[in-house]
Each structure stands twice: as structure tokens, then as C-alpha cells.
């Protein structure tokens, strides 16, 4: 499953200028932080809810399932005939079941009479039902029959309804599914655990003018005997698979199709009249399937793959085997009206979901503890795939900004969790669909791939997929296969990364010894609140690469740091050469250099001799060290000014994100405008070089960079940018000159931030007129930029209106919270005032966690952590408990950062104003 893109986390941190701060200072800061955490009850997660997995005495062999959805009254009828194996004599069968009413149930042992169930005991809290029988079911096989009814809900989970508008303007509904993690039980009674696999024979009774899809190809379509307006559609039997991967869709769709070079039928289903918008995803999918087949050396196991755009969809996409569901914005590309970033996103999401067809579907995690095996791996290999299809995207540099740093932000918190985390109750499972399972998982796999090399990695992946195909596996099984392929101690190394939370800070200092360079390395757990405080500091086995200015793109030495401290000698390094750790920013750690080593690296930023991904990593480490209180934020601002010649989009993107975090922090002060002046000074030179219009020879990354820079300058109030944005917006609205898709977001943001009620009304009109969901989302994401209190309230009210799809409400409210200090307060009040409606809308899924995170994490006053905690104590959100803890911790970290550095930042900005620096 691909989670929809979140706004950048407000939690960045790390590196070092000058000698380390006195340990006592760090200790005092850390202890005071942790005292505040403990006083608020935020230092540890609450006790886990009681949970038991299903008993093993009865298990399915095959589900024969027929569903008849009613698209007018939003109900469905179901008939299940499950071939089952009774492994231990029993008089009851326990299954998962939620929001379903069972009408009748019976069990017929093979060759014997049917036994009717005499009772259905629903355990609603545990989402289970116990079927009781009057006599003992003996060991052996038999058939379990259940007739049931359910509701096509509007919660975007289970078997639910999705609203769409026909080309003629009529509102209609499709019936669609979203079962991961634990919602197949809302469509039919089942053994809803990933390790309880079976085959499926699915039939759908649907209106004859509707499209019906499921995991497999259609094998029969015939009139339904009881109603001439209905047809019964039967699908081929699936391979052995987990319940969470079952899917069905009933609605009105067009499609485009092709065949991959391996002969697999590939279709992209789109809303009626928009088949053209499916062609880009179709092209990507047709390239991706053979790429994965060759990489894994395992063929795609189904005869077809459908990719379909769903109007109301909570996640970004879902990898159902053979029928992958997507948000419209994650699948559809309009050749004229889609921006470059949307094309890239579609390519990544398609690559992610198709990777799951092997890694997750063919071989499935044994339990949700190993979710990261699915999501971490897919989140890594999607980049490998896109790099293969679109090498011009420089996608691996973007990985560092999008995934690697995002994971480190979260994993530095006291309220993080290990990659492998014990989960039980469904509410706990929802919680781990986060940046640890996805982005940290992807980052440590990237590190592992680099450590053992591509050849042995591919060999190990083939061994793993071949051995466990159509079965389940745990993390240890993957390590064993990779260890056998590479001969390296994979389990010993990787257990330090997956079984304990956090990551190390590597401190390094250097000494020239004749013609060699002696490096002294030490590792300690990096903490967002400063130094680690505890009896036994965790240790990692860290693959470390070291490069020098002699050849910045090649590792001079690779080592495995398997102890707290070690010395390394680099042969033949001249005194004037710099030395850098973590070539390519591949190792999942932060680096803190001695002042002399760091000073030697800074010219490499100015003259671009450091590779882009290393410039990015160096800056990001510094910023994170400042957030943690290890260095002064002023030192980071000085380094940021060295990026005046920077040409790389992703480096600018990371700089922009960090300056955005700092701007949010300083919005709590009375010198917010001074940091905006700094932003304008840093971004003006690159803005002038780029201009507003594409130049001959420019490509994908230039388009991304132009939009980023103009948006940053416009938001900061850069006069020339603001004037040009207003001119182009006026021409766009009047139809004189339509804005290119790549310029719309920065222009919309700029005119709204510095506009009035008329500007907002025009934006809302553009939203209403937009035929394309990408354009609607583009507008929704910038509405929060408006500054006037009455307009902020208007945007918040709009967020819950019928004009905004349920899954997009979160980004509108989050945009308000991130737009200004007043917006943050207004958004928090709005959430509290409308909590019942919002919580019911998302039913405790991951969108509620996203909403909470985006809305409160930008606060920087200690008392707000207490207020947030108190609100959720009286308004429980079980699936967001960890997110709430993390948000409160971040609020305290922001407050500490502000108290510590605000005055020095202010003085530095005033000093710059008095005598602008020359760079």
C-alpha cells in the first residue's frame, strides 16, 4: 500500500561546527526534556490492548464467494461456501467479522450431513464471530456455508461506496474495496490474517451496464435469473493468497490496454471519458512488469494486471493482486494539464504497487510485525524501477530527501518504534503504516544493497521468492537468503537496524600522520532532544564508506563499524584533501565532524566538487544537529548561504524544507519577517537564473526546480515574484494565457498568501470548475496560505463541504495549520470543535493520524503538548496513540529549540541586515 504524500515533517535535526558542547550541558538539556515528557506521560506508549490471533483448529482451503451489491440503497448480500480443514475436533468456528450480519451458517463434513450453527456470538471489540454448533466437528475437510448481509459504507474501508459524477453531471456510486490491513472482514466473514492463505473463487452480481473487476480474469458472464437488469460475473480461481489482497470493483469505467513483452495483459481503468489520462501509467506498468521479472528472475504469476482509479480512496494506492487500486491523482496524467511532479509520483506509485505483486503478494509477511518486509522493500525498489524507466529524474538523490531524511526525523524521537514492532489489535496495526515501516525500511534496504552489492542482492532475492512463493515469511527468512547469497553476516548486521529503534550519530575527527589520515570514529544513539541518556547505549553494526576529494564519487575505503569506537587509517591522503563519511548518503546514520574536518568540506559545497547527494546530506545533518541542540542554528544558516551556486533540484528541495521548518518555528516570534528576508536572499539568485519560462534543453528536474523556487520566493513576499505571479494569475483567470501545470502551484500559493477575499473566491471558483482531480488537489493544498482570520475560517469550513473529497479534507486542514501561526491555532480549534465528525469520517484509519500530525506538530509552546494530550485523553483515537505521543514530543522539542536559539538567530539576522554577507 502506498500512503498518500504527507507534508514534510516538522522534525528535522543534526551535524557539527566546532568542538562538542560540554557533555554536562547536553545531559542537562536531555534530562529536562525527558522530565517534561514524563510529566506529561509521553515517555512511553500506553499498554497494549488485549489481543489473540485466531485459533488454528479450523482453517480455509478455498473461499467460493458471491456478492450482490446494491448501488442505490448501499447494502450488499453475500453467500460464502468455504472449503475448510478441521485440524482439531471442535464445536465452534471462530472467524473475523465486522459490520456484517450473518443470516444462516452451516458446516457439512465431507460425505456427511449438514450441521446448522445454533448461535452467532459477535465479539465486536475484537472484530470476531464465534459460530456455535450442536455437535462436534470432527477432524477432516468439509464445507462452511454462510449467508450474510452488510452495508456499503462511506468510510473508505472494507466493501464501500465511492461517489463520482458522470459526464452529464449525475451523481452515482461505485462499489469498491480496501482490505489492508484488517478490513476484508467487513466484506465477508473470513480468517483475516496474512498467514491464513487460501484460493478464492469470486462471483459478483451487478447491473448489466456496469464494469465488474476482481483479482483474476472473467471466465463467465451470464444473466442473473432473478432480475433481467443484473448479470452474474465469475472470475477465475486465484492462487493461494491472503485475504487483505482480495479486491472487487463495480462501477462505470473506460480503459486502455496493452501487453507487456512477457505477454501479460495490462489495463488501466479510468473514469468514463478519461481513457487518455491512463496512457502514461499504462506505459510505466508495461515497462515495470518485465523489469521486476528480470530483477527477481521470477515471472509475474497472474494472467492480467488491472490498475484502476477510485474517486474516494484513503491511501495513495493498494497492491491487490491483479487489481491495483489508486487515487485518481496517483494514476491519471493529463498530457496538457498534469505537472512534472505528478508524472513522477505516478511512476513511483505504479513501481511501488507492482513490486508488491512479488514482494508481499507472492511471498507475504507472516504477521504484521513484518509489515516492513512489504512496505520497506517496495519503497526502495520503486526508486530502482523509476531510475530504470526515467534515468533523467535523478531519483536516487530525491530518495534521500523524500525517504531517508523523513525516516531519520521520526526515528530520532523517544516515541519512535523499531522496524520490527510487535502488534496485535487492528488499531495497533494501523499505527505502523508510517515512515518507519516505509521510509526507514527502504533506507536500511538501500544500505544493505550497497553493503552486499547488486549481484548478490539479486541472487538472494531470487532464493527468497522461490523458496517462499505462495507462502509466508518473516524477516529472518530474508536475512538467511541474502546471507547464503553473499556470504556476509547479514542477520547480525541487520538485526541491529530492525529490532531496535533509532540510529547512530557517528562522531569523527582526523589527524594527519605523514602521508596518511588517521580517523577516530565513535558511535552513539542520536536523539532529537540531545544526547542519549541511559545505562546501556544501543550500538549498531554500521557499514561505513569513506571518500576523499581525490575522487569524490568513489569510496576510498569501506568498513563495518561493529564496536563503539574504532580507528581507521586512510593511506596516501594529502593534507589539503578533504575526507567525508557516508558517500552517497547511503548509510542510515548522522555524521558529526570535528570543526577542522567540517571546515575543509565547506568549499566543496561552494564549488560543487562534493556530489549533490553528499551536499544534501551534509546540510541535512547540520540542520538536525541544530534542532537537537548540539550546534547553534546560526552556524547552519551560515552554511546555507554557501549554496549560492547550487544547481540541483533535490538539494534545493531539502534546503527549502528545512527553511520552512525554521520559518514555522520563528512564526512564534516577532521577527518572522527577518527569516523571510533570509529566504529571499538565499533563493533570489537561483530564481533569477531560472526565470519564469522554460528554456531550450531544459528537462524534468528544471521544471521541478522552477516551481519550487518561485513558490518559495512568492510565499516569502519577494516583490518581483509577487508582481509577476499576480499578472500571470490574472491572465490565467481571464483566459488570456493559461498557466502551465508546473507554474500553477507556486502562482496559486503566492497570490493567496498575499491576497484578499476576492482572491480566495476566485480560487474556490477555479476549484469548482476543475474537471481534473489533480487540479482540485493542487488548489486544496494551497488554500491554507491565506492569512486573514475570516478567510482562514472560510477555508476550514470548505474542508468539510461536499466540494472536497473525504480523503482530501486532511490536506486542506493541514495546509491551514502549516500556513501561519493564526492558521495553526484556528485549525486546532476546528479539529476540536468538529472531532466527532472527523473521527467518524475516517473511522480511526491512518488518515486520522495524518490529520493530527499535520495540525498540531508545528506548535512550539510547552503547554500545547499538555493541551493536545488532555484532549485526546478525553477523545480517544486508538489507532493514533503513537502519533499523538510523537506530536507532543515534537512540540516540546520545538519549544526547547526556540528558547535555546531564538535570540541568537534574531541577532544574526539583524547583523546580516546591517551588513549583508558576500558569498
UniProtKB/Swiss-Prot annotation:
It is an enzyme of class 3 (hydrolase). It comes from the Eukaryota. Detected in liver, epithelium of renal tubules, epithelium of small and large intestine, gastric epithelial cells, and alveoli of the lung (at protein level). The active site is at 353 (proton acceptor). Keywords: Aminopeptidase, Cytoplasm, Hydrolase, Metal-binding, Metalloprotease, Nitration, Nucleus, Protease, Zinc. The record marks 438 as: Transition state stabilizer. GO terms for molecular function: alanyl aminopeptidase activity; aminopeptidase activity; metalloaminopeptidase activity; peptide binding; zinc ion binding. This is Puromycin-sensitive aminopeptidase. The lineage of its organism: Eukaryota, Metazoa, Chordata, Craniata, Vertebrata.
Amino acid at each position: 500500500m502506498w500512503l498518500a504524500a504527507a507534508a514534510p515533517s516538522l522534525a528535522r535535526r543534526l551535524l557539527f561546527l566546532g568542538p562538542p558542547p560540554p557533555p554536562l550541558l547536553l545531559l542537562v538539556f536531555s534530562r529536562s526534556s525527558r522530565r517534561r515528557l514524563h510529566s506529561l506521560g509521553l515517555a512511553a506508549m500506553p499498554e497494549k490492548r488485549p489481543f489473540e490471533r485466531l485459533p488454528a483448529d479450523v482453517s480455509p482451503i478455498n473461499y467460493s464467494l458471491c456478492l450482490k451489491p446494491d448501488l442505490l440503497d448501499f447494502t450488499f448480500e453475500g453467500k460464502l461456501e468455504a472449503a475448510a480443514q478441521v485440524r482439531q475436533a471442535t464445536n465452534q468456528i471462530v472467524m473475523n467479522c465486522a459490520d456484517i450480519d450473518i443470516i444462516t451458517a452451516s458446516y457439512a463434513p465431507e460425505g456427511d450431513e449438514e450441521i446448522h450453527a445454533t448461535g452467532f456470538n459477535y465479539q465486536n471489540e475484537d472484530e470476531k464471530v464465534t459460530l456455535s454448533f450442536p455437535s462436534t466437528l470432527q477432524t477432516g475437510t468439509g464445507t462452511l456455508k454462510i449467508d450474510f448481509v452488510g452495508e456499503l459504507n462511506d468510510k473508505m474501508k472494507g466493501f464501500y461506496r465511492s461517489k463520482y459524477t458522470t459526464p452529464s453531471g449525475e451523481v452515482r456510486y461505485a462499489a469498491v474495496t480496501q482490505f489492508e490491513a484488517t478490513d476484508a472482514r467487513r466484506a465477508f466473514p473470513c480468517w483475516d490474517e496474512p498467514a491464513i492463505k487460501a484460493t478464492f473463487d469470486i462471483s459478483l452480481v451487478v447491473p448489466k451496464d456496469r464494469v465488474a473487476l476482481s483479482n483474476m480474469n472473467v471466465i463467465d458472464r451470464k444473466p442473473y435469473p432473478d432480475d433481467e437488469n443484473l448479470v452474474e460475473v465469475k472470475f477465475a480461481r486465484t492462487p493461494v493468497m491472503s485475504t487483505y489482497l482480495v479486491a472487487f470493483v463495480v462501477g462505470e469505467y473506460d480503459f486502455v490496454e496493452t501487453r507487456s513483452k512477457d505477454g501479460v495483459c495490462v489495463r488501466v481503468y479510468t473514469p468514463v471519458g478519461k481513457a487518455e489520462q491512463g496512457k502514461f501509467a499504462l506505459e510505466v506498468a508495461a515497462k515495470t512488469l518485465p523489469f521486476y521479472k528480470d530483477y527477481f528472475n521470477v515471472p509475474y504469476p497472474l494472467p492480467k494486471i488491472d490498475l484502476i482509479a477510485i474517486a474516494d480512496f484513503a491511501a495513495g494506492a493498494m497492491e491487490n493482486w491483479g487489481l491495483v487500486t489508486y487515487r485518481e491523482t496517483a494514476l491519471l496524467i493529463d498530457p496538457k494539464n498534469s505537472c512534472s511532479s505528478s508524472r513522477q509520483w505516478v511512476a513511483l506509485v505504479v513501481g511501488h504497487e507492482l513490486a508488491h505483486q512479488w514482494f508481499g503478494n507472492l511471498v507475504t509477511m507472516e504477521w504484521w510485525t513484518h509489515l516492513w518486509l512489504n512496505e520497506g522493500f517496495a519503497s526502495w525498489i520503486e526508486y530502482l524501477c523509476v531510475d530504470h524507466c526515467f534515468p533523467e529524474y535523478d531519483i536516487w538523490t530525491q530518495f534521500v530527501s523524500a525517504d531517508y531524511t523523513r525516516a531519520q526525523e521520526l526515528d530520532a524521537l523517544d516515541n519512535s518504534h523499531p522496524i520490527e514492532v510487535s502488534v496485535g489489535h487492528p488499531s495497533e496495526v494501523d499505527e505502523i503504516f508510517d515512515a518507519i515501516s516505509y521510509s526507514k525500511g527502504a533506507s536500511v534496504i538501500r544500505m544493505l544493497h550497497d553493503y552486499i552489492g547488486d549481484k548478490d542482492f539479486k541472487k538472494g532475492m531470487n532464493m527468497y521468492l522461490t523458496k517462499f512463493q505462495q507462502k509466508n515469511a518473516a524477516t529472518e527468512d530474508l536475512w538467511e537468503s541474502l546471507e547464503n547469497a553473499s556470504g556476509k553476516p547479514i542477520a547480525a548486521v541487520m538485526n541491529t537496524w530492525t529490532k531496535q529503534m533509532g540510529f547512530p550519530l557517528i562522531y569523527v575527527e582526523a589527524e594527519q600522520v605523514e602521508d596518511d589520515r588517521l580517523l577516530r570514529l565513535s558511535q552513539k544513539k542520536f536523539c532529537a532532544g540531545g544526547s542519549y541518556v541511559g545505562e546501556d547505549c544501543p550500538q549498531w553494526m554500521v557499514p561505513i564508506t569513506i571518500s576523499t576529494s581525490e575522487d569524490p564519487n568513489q569510496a576510498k575505503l569501506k568498513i563495518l563499524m561493529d564496536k563503539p569506537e574504532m580507528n581507521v587509517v586512510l593511506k596516501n591522503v594529502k593534507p589539503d584533501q578533504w575526507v567525508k563519511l557516508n558517500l552517497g548518503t547511503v548509510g542510515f546514520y548522522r555524521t558529526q565532524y570535528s570543526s577542522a574536518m567540517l571546515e575543509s568540506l565547506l568549499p566543496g559545497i561552494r564549488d560543487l566538487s562534493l556530489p549533490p547527494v553528499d551536499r544534501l546530506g551534509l546540510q541535512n545533518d547540520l540542520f538536525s544537529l541544530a534542532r537537537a541542540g548540539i550546534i547553534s542554528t546560526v552556524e547552519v544558516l551560515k552554511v546555507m548561504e554557501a549554496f549560492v551556486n547550487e544547481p540541483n533540484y533535490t538539494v534545493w528541495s531539502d534546503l527549502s524544507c528545512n527553511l520552512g521548518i525554521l520559518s514555522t518555528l520563528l512564526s512564534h516570534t516577532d521577527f518572522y519577517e527577518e527569516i523571510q528576508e533570509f529566504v529571499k536572499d538565499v533563493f533570489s539568485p537561483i530564481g533569477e537564473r531560472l526565470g519564469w519560462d522554460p528554456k531550450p534543453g531544459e528537462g524534468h528536474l528544471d521544471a521541478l526546480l522552477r516551481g519550487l523556487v518561485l513558490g518559495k520566493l512568492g510565499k516569502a513576499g519577494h516583490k518581483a515574484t509577487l508582481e509577476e505571479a499576480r499578472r500571470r494569475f490574472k491572465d490565467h483567470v481571464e483566459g488570456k494565457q493559461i498557466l502551465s501545470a508546473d507554474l500553477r502551484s507556486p502562482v496559486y500559493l503566492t497570490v493567496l498568501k498575499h491576497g484578499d477575499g476576492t482572491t480566495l473566491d476566485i480560487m474556490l471558483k477555479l476549484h469548482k470548475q476543475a474537471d481534473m482531480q489533480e487540479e482540485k488537489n493542487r488548489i486544496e493544498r494551497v488554500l491554507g496560505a491565506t492569512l486573514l482570520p475570516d478567510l482562514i475560517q472560510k477555508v476550514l469550513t470548505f474542508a468539510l463541504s461536499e466540494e472536497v473529497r473525504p480523503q482530501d479534507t486532511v490536506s486542506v486542514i493541514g495546509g491551514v495549520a502549516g500556513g501561519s501561526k493564526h492558521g495553526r491555532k484556528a485549525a486546532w480549534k476546528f479539529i476540536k470543535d468538529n472531532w466527532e465528525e472527523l473521527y467518524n469520517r475516517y473511522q480511526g484509519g491512518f488518515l486520522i493520524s495524518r490529520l493530527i500530525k499535520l495540525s498540531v506538530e508545528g506548535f512550539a509552546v510547552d503547554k500545547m503538548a499538555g493541551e493536545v494530550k488532555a484532549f485526546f485523553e478525553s477523545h480517544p483515537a486508538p489507532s493514533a496513540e503513537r502519533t499523538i505521543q510523537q506530536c507532543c514530543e515534537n512540540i516540546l522539542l520545538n519549544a526547547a529549540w526556540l528558547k535555546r536559539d531564538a535570540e541568537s538567530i534574531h541577532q544574526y539576522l539583524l547583523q546580516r541586515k546591517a551588513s549583508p554577507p558576500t558569498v
